[in-house]
């Protein structure tokens, strides 16, 4: 019986991080967590990481789609935060989620969902590196594993 599992180390992976500027004080913490995980656990060279900034979470799927279409990356991490009450929460959160999932399916590329969808600012702060861990770091871990799984499945 063959079992395929993803390792965390992916030193040659080419990773694009698409990050929203809206709520940047939260998103920058997510970015720090993702970069730290890619470097320390994934052993990904900073030369293989590209950071692409866009206005907000609603724009993440389009930027991720164009990034995937370029065929220059093995995986994409999408980072952002949508806080209920600050925007049209349901629309932005839903379209962001659906759009990023569609990019992964259309282009056969892992797209890690590191977008916080929370009710309160305090929840976002907790999930960006305090009480509830760092969801940017968690997205990077998922991405590293998926890069290795897809490499095995495709070979």
UniProtKB/Swiss-Prot annotation:
Q: Where does (2S)-2-hydroxy-3-oxobutyl phosphate bind?
A: 86-87, 127
Q: Name one GO cellular component term.
A: riboflavin synthase complex
**Top-level taxon of origin:** Bacteria
Q: Where are the active-site residues found?
A: 88
Recorded catalytic reaction(s): these are: (2S)-2-hydroxy-3-oxobutyl phosphate + 5-amino-6-(D-ribitylamino)uracil = 6,7-dimethyl-8-(1-D-ribityl)lumazine + phosphate + 2 H2O + H(+)
Residues that bind 5-amino-6-(D-ribitylamino)uracil, according to the entry?
Answer: 22, 57-59, 81-83, 113
EC numbers listed for it are: 2.5.1.78
Name one process (GO BP) from the record. Answer: riboflavin biosynthetic process
Q: In which pathway does it act?
A: Cofactor biosynthesis; riboflavin biosynthesis; riboflavin from 2-hydroxy-3-oxobutyl phosphate and 5-amino-6-(D-ribitylamino)uracil: step 1/2
Enumerate the GO terms in the molecular function aspect: 6,7-dimethyl-8-ribityllumazine synthase activity
Asked whether the keyword Calcium is assigned, the reply is no
The disulfide bridges present are none
Q: What class of enzyme is it?
A: transferase
Q: Which UniProt keywords are present, listed alphabetically?
A: Riboflavin biosynthesis, Transferase
* Its biological purpose: Catalyzes the formation of 6,7-dimethyl-8-ribityllumazine by condensation of 5-amino-6-(D-ribitylamino)uracil with 3,4-dihydroxy-2-butanone 4-phosphate. This is the penultimate step in the biosynthesis of riboflavin.
Q: Which PANTHER family match?
A: 6,7-DIMETHYL-8-RIBITYLLUMAZINE SYNTHASE, 6,7-DIMETHYL-8-RIBITYLLUMAZINE SYNTHASE DMRL SYNTHASE LUMAZINE SYNTHASE
Family affiliation = Belongs to the DMRL synthase family.
Q: Which NCBIfam families match?
A: lumazine-synth (TIGR00114), PRK00061.1-4 (NF000812)
What is the protein name given in its UniProt record? Answer: 6,7-dimethyl-8-ribityllumazine synthase
